[in-house]
């Protein structure tokens, strides 16, 4: 009987949860859910100088916002340092590791010699079989793995296939530094083993680490977990992903108005495919996810495709869900628009009423919020340049003549205001647009908006007429 699937996401808290890390977390989450297993979260905080609480908070918040829940408590690698030291000492006792007293100067000379000879720098094993009694006085040694020197180290990778390294090219790596702190290589192996990880899914920049870590597993007599090294994400131009391409923190995507479900859907298709299907519900992703369907070449990040997919998710979302999502981005996007960081009951009600018209064109929540400007714009409305153009010439007099017809309406709705404006345009012998366009500009301050009669209905009689009177008095 096979053991239950356990995956892990193990970010270093030296910065935000970037988009590549988010995809790695998603793939681990999907694989665990696909097989009814568990995904664990480990914070690799052994770099004490660069690890920050703010970065830890950003990672956890980003995971929660994306809807990627983890099983059990968060595991902090630094807190397990004593266990890592214990394992290093056990390797020493079994003869699978040894004390190395090479000085910093000696190591630097090894690197320099290797460069001069045109080969990769590697430790030359000078303390591998040397008698410890020859140790120089007052020098604290490191502990190195006694790695195999002949044959090959092989990793059967679910994405990369069979990958081999000649053992002569892999030197005796450091397990424990001279100050007693464990190295990343040792800590990862011990933590993955103790956590019961059965499947490692991570970026292919860790592929060489897989060889090193496999050697540690075998020296300890532990089972090596299955491996899957996924290709990195590049920009649309094929270059290494940078901020201009979209190498941003997950919180930046949130604040730019992307829906978590849309971002999940976009990320799952970066490197993984399932036929020609582009749009996946979470349930469909889980049911279909397969490591063998991940390609080996770098995926390309395309903002245009992400925006298009996000727009689709916006159009298909319930109005109340979108209003809640707007409230999430208000702390970041509200103040610059003169909005509070949370919705007032009145504005929430107006947004709900306006949402059917607002969401048809928006590709992001920020666009949606900007389209809703007319709902929260202070009076008298400031006009953009195109709106000013629409209100030039005969437009003000037409609106002045229209005003009594609107004031006389017994019932105020999209249908009744449309009938009144159409009737007025016919009586004046002009096209509907010659009245509706200036009316839109007067009511919203913009040349584009949701359908103008929907705007009038959402604003209500008093607000709509007051804005029209403001413009006529200007």
UniProtKB/Swiss-Prot annotation:
Biased composition range(s): Basic and acidic residues: 113-133
CDD domains assigned: GluRS_core
Keywords from the UniProt entry: Aminoacyl-tRNA synthetase, ATP-binding, Cytoplasm, Ligase, Nucleotide-binding, Protein biosynthesis
Reactions it catalyzes: tRNA(Glu) + L-glutamate + ATP = L-glutamyl-tRNA(Glu) + AMP + diphosphate
Motif 'HIGH' region mapped to chain: 11-21
Tagged with keyword Protein biosynthesis: yes
Span of the signal peptide: none
Pfam family, one: tRNA-synt_1c
UniProt motif ('KMSKS' region) ranges: 240-244
Coarse class of the protein's main subcellular location: cytoplasm
Xref: InterPro entries: aa-tRNA-synth_I_cd-bd, aa-tRNA-synth_I_codon-bd_sub2, aa-tRNA-synth_I_CS, aa_tRNA-synth_I_cd-bd_sf, Glu-tRNA-ligase_bac/mito, Glu/Gln-tRNA-synth, Glu/Gln-tRNA-synth_Ib_cat-dom, GluQ/Sye
Record-listed E.C. numbers: 6.1.1.17
Compartmental location: Cytoplasm
Entry annotated with the keyword Chloroplast: no
Domain of life: Bacteria
Disulfide bonds: none
Subunit structure: Monomer.
Similarity annotation: Belongs to the class-I aminoacyl-tRNA synthetase family. Glutamate--tRNA ligase type 1 subfamily.
Entry function: Catalyzes the attachment of glutamate to tRNA(Glu) in a two-step reaction: glutamate is first activated by ATP to form Glu-AMP and then transferred to the acceptor end of tRNA(Glu).
Annotated protein name in UniProt: Glutamate--tRNA ligase 1
Organism: Methylorubrum populi (strain ATCC BAA-705 / NCIMB 13946 / BJ001) (Methylobacterium populi)
Gene: gltX1
């Amino acid at each position: 009987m096979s053991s239950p699937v356990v995956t892990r996401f193990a970010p270093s808290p030296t910065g935000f949860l970037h988009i590549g890390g988010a995809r790695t977390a998603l793939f681990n989450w999907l694989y665990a859910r696909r097989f009814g297993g568990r995904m664990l979260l480990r914070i690799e905080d052994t770099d004490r100088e660069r690890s920050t609480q703010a970065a830890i908070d950003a990672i956890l918040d980003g995971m929660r916002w994306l809807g990627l829940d983890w099983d059990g408590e968060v595991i902090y690698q630094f807190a397990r340092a004593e266990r890592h030291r214990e394992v290093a000492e056990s390797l020493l006792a079994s003869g699978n590791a040894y004390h190395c007293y090479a000085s910093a100067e000696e190591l630097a000379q090894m690197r320099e010699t290797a460069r001069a000879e045109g080969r990769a720098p590697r430790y030359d094993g000078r303390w591998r079989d040397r008698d410890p009694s020859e140790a120089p006085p007052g020098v604290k040694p490191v502990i190195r793995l006694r790695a195999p020197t002949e044959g090959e180290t092989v990793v059967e990778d679910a994405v990369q296939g069979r990958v081999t390294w000649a053992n002569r090219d892999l030197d005796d790596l450091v397990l424990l530094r001279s100050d007693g702190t464990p190295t990343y290589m040792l800590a990862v192996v011990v933590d993955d083993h103790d956590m019961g990880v059965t499947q490692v899914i991570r970026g292919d920049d860790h592929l060489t680490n897989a060889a090193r870590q496999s050697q540690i597993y075998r020296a300890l007599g532990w089972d090596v977990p299955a491996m899957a090294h996924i290709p990195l994400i590049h920009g649309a131009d094929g270059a290494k992903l940078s901020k201009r391409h979209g190498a941003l923190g997950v919180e930046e995507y949130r604040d730019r108005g992307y829906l978590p479900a849309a971002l999940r859907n976009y990320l799952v298709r970066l490197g993984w495919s399932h036929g020609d299907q582009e749009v996946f519900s979470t349930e469909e992703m889980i049911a279909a996810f397969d490591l063998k369907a991940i390609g080996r070449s770098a995926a390309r990040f395309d903002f245009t495709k992400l925006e298009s997919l996000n727009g689709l998710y916006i159009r298909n979302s319930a109005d109340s869900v979108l209003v809640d999502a707007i409230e999430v981005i208000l702390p970041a996007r509200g103040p610059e628009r003169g909005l509070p960081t949370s919705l007032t009951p009145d504005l929430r009600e107006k947004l709900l009423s306006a949402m059917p018209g607002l969401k048809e064109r928006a590709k992001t929540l920020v666009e949606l919020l900007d389209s809703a400007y007319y709902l929260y714009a202070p009076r008298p409305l400031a006009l953009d340049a195109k709106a000013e153009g629409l209100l030039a010439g005969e437009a003000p007099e037409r609106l002045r003549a229209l005003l009594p017809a609107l004031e006389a309406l017994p019932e105020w709705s999209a249908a009744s205001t449309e009938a009144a404006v159409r009737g007025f345009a016919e009586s004046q012998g002009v096209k509907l647009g010659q009245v509706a366009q200036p009316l839109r500009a007067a009511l919203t301050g913009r040349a584009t908006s949701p359908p103008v009669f929907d705007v009038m209905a959402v604003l209500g009689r008093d607000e709509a007429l007051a804005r029209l009177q403001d413009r006529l008095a200007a």
